[in-house]
């Protein structure tokens, strides 16, 4: 006999996070949560707590809030775009799996809507199966690893656990590579081809990579495959890493240093794409599109363009559907009495 209602399956699109508003107090709350995660800062926690509370949080939130204010239009860009991605993927999946009730929801590792809160709410509403899709194309312990941690901590508090599957990453998925290449082609059809195309990825400290974090290798694989898809020669593109924090060495080459060197060396035009970001955010709209543009132009460069992230582009939603739908179908096939 079938139950009265078909089983509920939820797909969660998870991104890093954002403050609730572009103010120093809101940014301070967000940074405290983010920078307190030992996945992000791998130094002894008692020592880092002193540095964070005495030196970072008293000064950094005001500067970061001003940067957020420069890109804030009614809401944080990353949350606004995440909601758009959710709506589009929901429209694709809703009603596509027979009698099953499938929904798509946003979640964040830090800030709101927090992943544990979303899980609590949906479980209370009767969701029994989850597909978790972290929107970090290249897995790193500092990003995707934090999603695994949050789910593990949440699970330890549950009496009746739901089923869930996590998509680790998709750095070489053919639809991802094609979507990136096509977005670059469309941009260059309007703005022309540059002297140099830069693939700028968010950096991680070099010691993290030395300990086995696969992120840099995944970034290099993504960039190389997109460059190959575009038919670029080796001297037409480069991979670099941005957003250094603190004084330790990070994975090189550095985006800002490379741009300054190019400007001084006579490189006239540069276009920058940042494949690690599934949605435009502070690091792309302010750091890449504005701050690093100034670095390049002030060093002697003449033309600089940032190529937007995939955001809610239909090809990006195609990728998300291709990642989520087989897992949703997998859950559906195990639900005896409803298949």
From Swiss-Prot:
Catalyses which reaction(s): heme b + 2 H(+) = protoporphyrin IX + Fe(2+)
Main subcellular location of this protein, as a coarse class: cytoplasm
Spell out the GO cellular component terms annotated for this protein, sorted alphabetically and separated by semicolons: cytoplasm
Q: Which Gene3D superfamilies match?
A: 3.40.50.1400
Where is this chain's protein located in or outside the cell? Answer: Cytoplasm
Keywords attached to this entry: Cytoplasm, Heme biosynthesis, Iron, Lyase, Metal-binding, Porphyrin biosynthesis
Which InterPro entries does the record associate with it?
Ferrochelatase (IPR001015), Ferrochelatase_AS (IPR019772), Ferrochelatase_C (IPR033644), Ferrochelatase_N (IPR033659)
- Where does the chain bind Fe cation? 202, 283
For this protein, the parts annotated as crossing the membrane are none
Give me any GO biological process, just one: heme biosynthetic process
Tell me a Gene Ontology molecular-function term this record carries: metal ion binding
Q: What does this protein do?
A: Catalyzes the ferrous insertion into protoporphyrin IX.
Q: What is this protein called?
A: Ferrochelatase
- Identify the species of origin: Psychrobacter sp. (strain PRwf-1)
**High-level lineage:** Bacteria, Pseudomonadati, Pseudomonadota, Gammaproteobacteria, Moraxellales
């Amino acid at each position: 006999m079938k139950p009265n209602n078909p089983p509920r399956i939820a797909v969660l699109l998870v991104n890093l996070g954002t403050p609730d508003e572009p103010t120093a107090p809101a940014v301070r709350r967000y940074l405290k949560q983010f920078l307190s995660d030992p996945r992000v800062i791998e130094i002894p926690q008692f020592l880092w707590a002193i540095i964070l509370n005495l030196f970072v949080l008293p000064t950094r939130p005001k500067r970061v809030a001003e940067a957020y204010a420069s890109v804030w239009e009614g809401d944080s860009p990353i949350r606004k775009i995440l909601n758009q991605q959710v709506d589009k993927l929901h429209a694709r999946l809703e009603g596509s799996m027979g009698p099953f009730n499938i929904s798509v929801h946003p979640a964040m590792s830090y800030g709101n809507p927090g992943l544990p809160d979303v899980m609590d709410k949906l479980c209370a509403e009767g969701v029994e199966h989850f597909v978790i899709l972290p929107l970090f194309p290249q897995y790193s312990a500092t990003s995707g690893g934090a999603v695994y941690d949050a789910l593990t901590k949440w699970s330890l508090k549950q009496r009746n656990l739901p089923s869930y599957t996590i998509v680790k990453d998709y750095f070489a998925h053919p639809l991802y590579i094609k979507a990136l290449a096509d977005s670059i082609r469309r941009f260059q059809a309007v703005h022309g081809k540059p002297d140099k195309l830069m693939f700028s990825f968010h950096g991680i400290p070099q010691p993290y990579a030395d300990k086995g974090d696969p992120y840099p290798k995944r970034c290099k694989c993504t960039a190389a495959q997109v460059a190959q898809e575009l038919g670029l020669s080796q001297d037409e593109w480069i991979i670099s890493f941005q957003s250094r924090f603190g004084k330790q060495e990070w994975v090189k080459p550095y985006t800002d240093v490379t741009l300054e060197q190019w400007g001084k060396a006579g490189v006239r035009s540069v276009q920058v794409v940042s494949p690690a970001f599934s949605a435009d955010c502070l690091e792309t709209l302010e750091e890449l599109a504005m701050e690093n543009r100034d670095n390049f132009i002030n060093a002697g460069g003449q033309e600089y363009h940032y190529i937007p992230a995939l955001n809610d582009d239909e090809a990006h939603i195609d990728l998300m559907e291709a990642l989520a739908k087989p897992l949703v179908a997998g859950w559906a096939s195990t639900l005896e009495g409803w298949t």
